[in-house]
């Protein structure tokens, strides 16, 4: 029997595990997973590929063609006629995405795409900073994930070690703290928890434990009994 469809928004700081957890929830309930940050990464990729400077929002906007960025209903990100979903994970793109995500007009473009995409649809789980109050303010279930910066840095180090990536703990911690500062102090849609979001501190819990907690919240919201303990 298929699960009832609701829309879920997952918010929280960088490195807290939003994507991993949201993917597991999406797979469990057969929902569509959308990583909102991938759109900022795609714009950063487009600028890098086309040698567009990101130091000025005004100049950058002039070089972005109409309707150049889109999503499909498998959650893939498209730049014009190219699916770039698997081309967006490297340090330079991450760094540049963090910069352009501060620009109000860029955030407006991304938010409009995401809101148009989810309009009149259910069964979508979106994750990203500002998802719970700006991108998906009418979500049926809102979750704000949290963990202290040191815990997030340790998790990132473990992940990088597994991927055989050379990284230093202090460098990771510094990058996470810097990203937190940018997210919390930006003028447009800063990182914050809304009053209607459920706060989950993941610091002392495993990923599976958090997935289990969120699953129970979903079951409760859709009015179905959960066999999970």
From Swiss-Prot:
Catalysed reactions listed for this entry: CMP + ATP = CDP + ADP; dCMP + ATP = dCDP + ADP
Principal localisation: cytoplasm
Signal peptide (residue range): none
TM helices/strands, residue ranges: none
Xref: InterPro entries: Cytidylate_kin (IPR003136), Cytidylate_kinase_dom (IPR011994), P-loop_NTPase (IPR027417)
Keywords: ATP-binding, Cytoplasm, Kinase, Nucleotide-binding, Transferase
A GO CC term attached to the entry: cytoplasm
Subcellular localization: Cytoplasm
One annotated GO biological process: pyrimidine nucleotide metabolic process
GO molecular function: ATP binding; CMP kinase activity; dCMP kinase activity
UniProt EC number: 2.7.4.25
Binding-site list for ATP: 12-20
NCBIfam families xrefs: cmk
Family, as annotated: Belongs to the cytidylate kinase family. Type 1 subfamily.
Protein name: Cytidylate kinase
Record organism: Mesomycoplasma hyopneumoniae (strain 232) (Mycoplasma hyopneumoniae)
Lineage of producing organism: Bacteria, Bacillati, Mycoplasmatota, Mycoplasmoidales, Metamycoplasmataceae
Name of the coding gene: cmk
């Amino acid at each position: 029997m298929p699960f009832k469809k609701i829309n879920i928004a997952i918010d929280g700081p960088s490195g807290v595990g939003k994507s991993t957890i949201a993917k597991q929830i999406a797979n469990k309930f057969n929902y569509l997973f959308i990583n909102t940050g991938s759109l900022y990464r795609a714009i950063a990729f487009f600028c890098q590929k086309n040698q567009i400077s990101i130091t000025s929002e005004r100049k950058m906007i002039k070089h972005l063609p109409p309707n150049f960025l889109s999503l499909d209903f498998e959650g893939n990100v498209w730049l014009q006629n190219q699916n770039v979903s698997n081309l967006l994970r490297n340090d330079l793109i991450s760094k540049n995405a963090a910069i352009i995500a501060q620009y109000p007009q860029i955030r407006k473009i991304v938010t409009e795409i995401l809101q148009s995409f989810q309009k009149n649809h259910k069964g979508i789980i979106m994750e990203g900073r500002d998802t719970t109050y700006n991108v998906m303010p009418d979500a049926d279930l809102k979750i704000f994930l949290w963990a202290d910066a040191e815990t997030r840095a340790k998790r990132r180090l473990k992940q990088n070690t597994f991927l055989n990536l050379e990284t230093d703990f202090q460098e990771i911690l510094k990058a996470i703290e810097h990203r937190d500062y940018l997210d919390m102090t930006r003028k447009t849609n800063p990182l914050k928890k809304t009053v209607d979001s459920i706060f989950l501190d993941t610091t002392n819990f495993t990923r599976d434990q958090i997935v289990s907690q969120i699953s129970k919240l979903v079951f409760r919201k859709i009015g179905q009994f959960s066999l999970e303990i």
